[in-house]
């Protein structure tokens, strides 16, 4: 989930270290970080009085990692397979003598001027300290080729046929300076489910940034959040541009990490971060993953795209935003037809560059938040962070017809002191001329990016935008009898996105930034049902998979990766979304780090991949 601070970036030794005990090393030769933990024990569970009781049992993996039979039939027109082990091998850059000399000089500048003078003696804030940001199960792992016929506790529902995928940050190289969790290289974890059987694989998304850094053998692209603050951030930017001018790197091919969102659209699985174009990732018949390349929608997309596009469940249209932190227009809105034809951009006039991580759609509108976390690059000159909480700014939400050709039809409605990093759903209520927005209001708004002594709170909130009066109201959704809990990552039934929904499935983000379980929230009554992962168990986004042919809104299953920090083992849990009952736990052959967002690709969609 790289911040779009990376947007203004684009206008050694490979010794393995123990990633779970990572500590910052000021070295000009960073090490390769990836190193999976061996699994010794796995957990078994039973549901007792609505909570999950955990015990440990010996691991008994007898996995066939070389099964010759494909996990789904090979389509007649399937492209020639790429062997990831071969494509992942580093290829040294073909520099001439002058470039090699220039590279050595710039490396000396980085070591002696930036690291030893500008950065030495300045303690890193927790939000940029690698020892904090990528410690424990936030640390990276190595790639895994497909492991088939995984052990399963319980029974995988036979109606689940397809692949669950989840994206996350997984830095290949040890940071040379500051590092935020959002800065890591993208890695996709995939669990194939078919006829009660499961397989697992994980691969880096082969971004242009990753390929160039692998060729050089070290991290050379600036870390958007971890490094780009203060005078050292300016120096690292200048160093980056110097390397580009000398042909040592090519930022025109993209600087993004593709570590945040995943969506399946127009027969393609897309991995996204808001600092670049999306990347097309292909799911292979044997359960493996391969990166097809940077995807520009056949030349139609020339700008970055945020990592939370929206897919209308009725029209199958794709809606997205793109924002810029340097030049106007700071924000653009566009859409794609179901077959991938792009609309003209709609320029949204904003007075200053604003963080735009998420937005919402209804049947007829797009809902665009313009909130109080903004970009002020000049703050770096004064030694600060360019990501700023502007307390003087009044947050507002824009309501724009989906098919508007310009921003003249935009209606802005103030929603003071509101910062929603994510919006879970939105719908129209014509009887009151209101648009309802469901989101998690976060305080302090910039706490993810800047160190704060105030504890983070993420309050599930209903915001009402009255289109007739131009006023807004908001209220916390949980009933007063329920103690406040942080509800942050999750979703509603995607088949009802943009329409009135009753339920949301959201991660219990406690103790922050870990996730100790998830909640099924009744958005009307405020009642919640909790599924807790037990002592030492933590996960991430709960992903709702609707049951095919079922009309019930909660008819389906919730999938979530869960890691046991006591034993070092990871599982995929499958819960019944209606009664919150655990159906199955798939034991995974390697540790799955905490990550970001997922998607589910059905067996039918697997056959139709481009």
Curated annotation (Swiss-Prot):
One Pfam assignment: RPE65
Catalyses which reaction(s): a 9-cis-epoxycarotenoid + O2 = a 12'-apo-carotenal + 2-cis,4-trans-xanthoxin; 9-cis-violaxanthin + O2 = (3S,5R,6S)-5,6-epoxy-3-hydroxy-5,6-dihydro-12'-apo-beta-caroten-12'-al + 2-cis,4-trans-xanthoxin; 9'-cis-neoxanthin + O2 = (3S,5R,6R)-3,5-dihydroxy-6,7-didehydro-5,6-dihydro-12'-apo-beta-caroten-12'-al + 2-cis,4-trans-xanthoxin
Main location: plastid
GO function terms (MF aspect): 9-cis-epoxycarotenoid dioxygenase activity; metal ion binding
Subcellular location as annotated: Plastid, Chloroplast
Cofactor note: Binds 1 Fe(2+) ion per subunit.
Binding positions (Fe cation): 308, 357, 422
KW Acyltransferase (keyword) present: no
Swiss-Prot/TrEMBL GO biological process terms: abscisic acid biosynthetic process; carotene catabolic process
Presequence extent in this chain: 1-53
Tissue note: Expressed in flower buds. Detected in sepals, petals, lips and lip crests.
Enzyme Commission number: 1.13.11.51
Keyword field: Abscisic acid biosynthesis, Chloroplast, Dioxygenase, Iron, Metal-binding, Oxidoreductase, Plastid, Stress response, Transit peptide
Known function: Has a 11,12(11',12') 9-cis epoxycarotenoid cleavage activity. Catalyzes the first step of abscisic-acid biosynthesis from carotenoids. Not active on the all-trans isomers of violaxanthin and neoxanthin. Contributes probably to abscisic acid synthesis for the induction of seed dormancy.
Family: Belongs to the carotenoid oxygenase family.
PANTHER family according to UniProt: 9-CIS-EPOXYCAROTENOID DIOXYGENASE NCED3, CHLOROPLASTIC, BETA-CAROTENE DIOXYGENASE
Name of this protein: 9-cis-epoxycarotenoid dioxygenase, chloroplastic
Source species of the chain: Oncidium hybrid cultivar
Gene that produces this protein: NCED
């Amino acid at each position: 989930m790289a911040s779009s601070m990376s947007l203004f970036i684009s206008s050694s030794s490979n010794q393995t270290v123990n990633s779970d005990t990572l500590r910052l090393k000021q070295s000009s030769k960073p090490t390769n970080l990836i190193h999976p933990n061996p699994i010794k024990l796995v957990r078994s569970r039973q549901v007792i009085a609505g909570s999950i009781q955990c015990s440990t049992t010996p691991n008994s993996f007898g996995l066939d990692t070389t099964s010759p039979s494909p996990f789904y039939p090979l389509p007649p027109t399937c492209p020639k397979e790429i062997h990831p082990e071969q494509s992942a091998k580093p290829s040294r850059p073909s520099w001439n003598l002058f470039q090699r000399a220039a590279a050595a000089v710039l490396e000396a500048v980085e070591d002696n001027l930036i690291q030893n003078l500008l950065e030495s003696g300045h303690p890193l804030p927790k939000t940029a300290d690698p020892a904090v940001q990528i410690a424990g199960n936030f640390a990276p792992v190595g790639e895994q080729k497909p492991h088939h016929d995984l052990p399963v506790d319980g029974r995988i529902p036979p109606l689940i046929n397809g692949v669950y995928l989840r994206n996350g940050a997984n830095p290949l190289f040890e940071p040379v300076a500051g590092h935020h969790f959002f800065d890591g290289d993208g890695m996709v974890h995939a669990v194939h489910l078919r006829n009660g059987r499961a397989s697992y694989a994980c691969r880096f998304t082969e971004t242009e940034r990753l390929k160039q850094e692998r060729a050089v053998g070290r991290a050379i692209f600036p870390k958007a959040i971890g490094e780009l603050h203060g005078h050292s951030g300016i120096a690292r930017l200048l160093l980056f541009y110097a390397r580009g001018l000398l042909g040592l790197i090519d930022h025109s091919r993209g600087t993004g990490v593709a570590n945040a969102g995943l969506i399946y659209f127009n027969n393609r699985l897309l991995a996204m971060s808001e600092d670049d174009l999306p990347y097309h990732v292909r799911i292979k018949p044997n359960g493996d993953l391969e990166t097809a390349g940077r995807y520009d929608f056949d030349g139609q997309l020339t700008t970055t795209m945020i990592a939370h596009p929206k897919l209308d469940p009725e029209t199958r249209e794709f809606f997205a935003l793109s924002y810029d932190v340097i030049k106007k227009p700071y924000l653009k809105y566009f859409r794609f037809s179901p077959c991938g034809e792009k609309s003209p951009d709609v320029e949204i006039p904003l007075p200053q560059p604003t963080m735009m991580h998420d937005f919402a759609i209804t049947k007829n509108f797009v809902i665009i938040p313009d909130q109080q976390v903004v970009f002020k690059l000049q703050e770096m000159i004064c030694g600060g962070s360019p990501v700023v909480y502007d307390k003087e700014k009044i947050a507002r939400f824009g309501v724009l017809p989906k098919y508007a050709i310009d921003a003249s039809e935009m209606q802005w409605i103030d929603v003071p002191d509101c910062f929603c990093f994510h919006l879970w759903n939105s719908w129209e209520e014509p009887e009151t001329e209101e648009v309802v927005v469901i989101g998690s209001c976060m305080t302090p708004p910039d706490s993810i990016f800047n160190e704060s002594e105030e504890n983070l709170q993420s309050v599930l909130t209903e915001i009402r935008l009255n289109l007739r009066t131009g006023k807004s109201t908001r209220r916390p959704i949980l009933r007063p009898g329920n103690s406040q809990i942080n509800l942050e990552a999750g979703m509603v039934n995607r088949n009802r996105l943009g329409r009135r929904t009753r339920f949301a499935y959201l991660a219990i983000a406690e103790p922050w930034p870990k996730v100790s379980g998830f909640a099924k929230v009744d958005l009307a009554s405020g009642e919640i049902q909790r599924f807790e992962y037990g002592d030492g168990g933590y996960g991430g986004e709960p992903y709702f998979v609707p049951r095919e042919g079922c009309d019930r809104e909660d008819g389906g299953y919730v999938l979530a990766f869960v890691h046991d920090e006591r034993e070092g083992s990871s599982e995929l849990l499958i819960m019944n979304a209606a009664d919150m009952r655990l159906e199955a736990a798939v034991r995974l052959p390697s540790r799955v780090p905490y990550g970001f967002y997922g998607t589910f690709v059905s067996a039918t969609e697997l056959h139709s991949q481009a």
